Curated annotation (Swiss-Prot):
Probable toxin. It is found in: Secreted. One of its GO terms (cellular component) is extracellular region. GO terms for molecular function: toxin activity. It comes from Megalopyge opercularis (Southern flannel moth). Belongs to the caterpillar 4 family. This is U-megalopygitoxin(4)-Mo5. Expressed by the venom apparatus. Its main location: secreted. Keywords: Secreted, Signal, Toxin. Residues 1-23 form the signal peptide. It comes from the Eukaryota.
């Protein structure tokens, strides 16, 4: 029981970390796209 609980907590932490890094990458891509649009104008 205790082992499975630790696995669930670990999996949740990994999922949160993956979501955080993914969001940061998406934000950087959006900033690059916005910067590119401003340069074109």
């Amino acid at each position: 029981m205790k082992c499975s609980l630790l696995l669930v907590v670990f999996a949740a932490m990994v999922a949160l970390f993956a979501a955080g890094t993914n969001a940061a990458m998406n934000q950087r891509k959006m900033l690059e796209v916005i910067g590119g649009l401003k340069k074109e104008k």
